[in-house]
A protein has these predicted regions:
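Polar/charged heptad-repeat coiled-coil helices used as signal-transmission/dimerization stalks
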Residues: 4-167
């Protein structure tokens, strides 16, 4: 009788462990991007394995939600940067995520877009004034670096050169 009970208990424990293992392997496959879906662990047993499965399932669902949230922001970032590449600087990232690093990246991209759009608008404004024969205003070079600084200096030099020609 003891041997039969031991065998039955062993089978139940081994079966529960195998179910738990399969669920974890499915989750790790999802985390490692080997699978696009994640399966929850079987939490139907009324023992410690069922309790552990419930805790793990809660965390799988939280992690899955977070990963999907991150993917949506990454997809939106790719789309927005594709528009930037074509010259549309009005685009911004709008999705909010719980991942602090991705939120910081979102803010950096949006701030960069704001700054570049403002600087390009400043250049266009001055060029529009030049086309109306008004060469008095200049582009501020404060806080500009490299290419934007060269662009602003180039436009300012153009205005100075035209003014010198007219004098």
């Amino acid at each position: 009788l003891f041997i039969i009970i031991s065998v039955l208990i062993s089978k139940v424990v081994i079966n529960s462990l195998n179910n738990f293992k399969e669920g974890l392997l499915s989750f790790f496959s999802y985390l490692n991007r080997e699978s696009s879906k994640v399966s929850l662990l079987n939490e139907s047993s009324n023992d410690e394995f069922g309790e552990m499965a419930k805790v793990v399932n809660d965390n799988i669902e939280k992690t899955q939600k977070s990963i999907e949230e991150d993917r949506r922001l990454i997809d939106e970032t790719i789309a927005v940067l594709g528009e930037f590449e074509q010259g549309d600087l009005c685009q911004r990232l709008n999705i909010s995520v719980s991942n602090p690093a991705l939120m910081e990246l979102k803010n950096v991209v949006n701030n960069m877009a704001n700054n570049i759009e403002t600087n390009i608008d400043n250049v266009l404004n001055i060029l529009e004034q030049y086309s109306s024969y008004n060469y008095l205003n200049k582009i501020s070079t404060k806080n500009l670096k490299e290419h934007l600084l060269k662009l602003a200096n180039g436009v300012n030099t153009l205005g100075d050169s035209i003014t010198q020609m007219l004098v």
